[in-house]
């Protein structure tokens, strides 16, 4: 049995067609069920539905053999018990700094609000900026508006939410997409089925990319 960890929301919705092409179709609709462990039409695969930030933890500690997680989560996690064999090319967006329009990011000292504390600290340290990073769990756009922070670090897709709150994207930290991650021990113990699934997904991703070119 292979257990795949995935989060509800955009990643799950964009992963569903990809998994379906690999023959992995949930037998239960997670939007209509309270079940967190979902059987699939394949007897050898099940899905566990968890918070996005918890996917790498479940995989690293062996509660799931594989997972689908955004690069933003993986970079912030800083774990060592994972392989990251495949960029699935889904849930694309950008991790950026953002703040009031026309106000450049300070060159020496500033206060930053984000849930990506580790990533933000590394980014500003590389730029030689002394940053006080404040961890928030949501409503990042509010922080600069009420004087809590000079800027934020957050995911940006269309930028509509930023604009609606009087903010603008500033600096790109990294492009984000969702990745397949694998538990290192499971890779040894279940090498055959894991590499077969990863290879199948890789072929699907390559075919999609070829169609989009």
Curated annotation (Swiss-Prot):
Q: Which domain of life is it from?
A: Bacteria
Domain commentary: Lacks the C-terminal regulatory region which is replaced by HisZ.
Instruction: Provide the E.C. number(s) assigned to this enzyme.
Output: 2.4.2.17
The UniProt function text for this chain reads: Catalyzes the condensation of ATP and 5-phosphoribose 1-diphosphate to form N'-(5'-phosphoribosyl)-ATP (PR-ATP). Has a crucial role in the pathway because the rate of histidine biosynthesis seems to be controlled primarily by regulation of HisG enzymatic activity.
Name the lineage.
Answer: Bacteria, Pseudomonadati, Pseudomonadota, Gammaproteobacteria, Methylococcales
* Pathway recorded for this protein: Amino-acid biosynthesis; L-histidine biosynthesis; L-histidine from 5-phospho-alpha-D-ribose 1-diphosphate: step 1/9
This enzyme catalyses: 1-(5-phospho-beta-D-ribosyl)-ATP + diphosphate = 5-phospho-alpha-D-ribose 1-diphosphate + ATP
Q: Quote the Pfam families the UniProt record gives.
A: HisG
Q: Which gene encodes it?
A: hisG
Gene Ontology BP, a term: L-histidine biosynthetic process
Summary of subunit composition and partner proteins: Heteromultimer composed of HisG and HisZ subunits.
Protein's recorded name: ATP phosphoribosyltransferase
Q: What is its main location?
A: cytoplasm
Q: Which family does it belong to?
A: Belongs to the ATP phosphoribosyltransferase family. Short subfamily.
Question: Which keywords does this chain's UniProt record carry?
Answer: Amino-acid biosynthesis, ATP-binding, Cytoplasm, Glycosyltransferase, Histidine biosynthesis, Nucleotide-binding, Transferase
Q: Which InterPro entries match?
A: ATP_PRibTrfase_cat (IPR013820), ATP_PRibTrfase_CS (IPR018198), ATP_PRibTrfase_HisG (IPR001348), ATP_PRibTrfase_HisG_short (IPR024893)
Q: What class of enzyme is it?
A: transferase
According to its UniProt entry, this protein's organism is Methylococcus capsulatus (strain ATCC 33009 / NCIMB 11132 / Bath)
**One cellular-component annotation, GO:** cytoplasm
Subcellular location as annotated: Cytoplasm
GO MF annotations, alphabetized: ATP binding; ATP phosphoribosyltransferase activity
């Amino acid at each position: 049995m292979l257990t795949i960890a995935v989060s509800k929301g955009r990643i799950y919705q964009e992963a569903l067609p990809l998994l379906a092409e690999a023959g992995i179709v949930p037998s239960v609709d997670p939007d209509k069920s309270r079940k967190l462990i979902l059987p699939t039409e394949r007897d050898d695969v099940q899905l566990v539905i968890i918070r996005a930030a918890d996917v790498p933890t479940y995989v690293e500690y062996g509660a799931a053999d594989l997972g689908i997680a955004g690069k933003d989560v993986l970079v912030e996690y800083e774990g060592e018990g994972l392989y990251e064999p495949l960029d699935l090319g889904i849930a694309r967006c950008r991790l950026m700094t953002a703040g009031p329009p026309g106000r450049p990011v300070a060159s020496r000292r500033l206060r930053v609000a984000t849930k990506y504390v580790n990533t933000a600290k590394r980014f500003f340290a590389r730029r030689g900026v002394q940053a006080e990073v404040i961890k928030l769990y949501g409503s990042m756009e509010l922080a600069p508006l009420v004087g809590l922070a000079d800027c934020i670090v957050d995911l940006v897709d269309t930028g509509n939410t930023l604009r609606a709150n009087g903010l603008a994207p500033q600096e790109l930290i990294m492009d984000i997409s969702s990745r397949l991650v694998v538990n290192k021990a499971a890779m040894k113990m279940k090498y055959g089925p894991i590499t077969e699934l990863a290879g199948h997904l890789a072929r699907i991703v390559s075919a999609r990319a070829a169609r989009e070119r």
